[in-house]
Amino acid sequence: MSNIAPLLDRNRAFASAPGARQGMPRLPFIPTLNLYIVTCIDCRVDPAQILGVKLGEALVQRNIGGRITPAVIRDIAYAGYLVDTKAPEGPYFEVAIVHHTDCGSTLLADDELRHGFAQRIGADERTLADTPVLDPARTVRTDVERVLWADEIPENVRVSGHVYDVGTGVVTTIVDAKGRK
């Protein structure tokens, strides 16, 4: 049996439940909270659990460390463009970046492991050296600035930065929502 089999059973229960899809956004890709969350792939950092995000409320993008990369910038720019063109009368669109304590990306700080991984996937080792979330408050500030300074990001986008403590379960705001400079 596949590892996803129990989840497919849950999906059938979800799909058949009355009102399961209520509260979905009126327009595709524009979440009801005008929120885009970028966070880590770590299974302990699920926005639905730690923030109570419900279906249709936010776009969620996950990658190693929840770091802002050129691909993430492009995706945020696309979402911001959709909001700009399809719902220009709406409120600003917020990107919430959430890093966390005890992040597995710290393993990429190990020179030998990072070198081996870079060789295996054909990645630039210098780029991987910038990935580890050793100090989540520092890295989330850096990533907020990366979004704010990206030319592709529309003016309607605000960015905030947060740190989730996996030990306490508390999310702390490090950078309040702010717009481009």
Model segments located where?
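A glycine-rich, hydrophobic loop/mini-helix early in the fold
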Residues: 43-73, 77
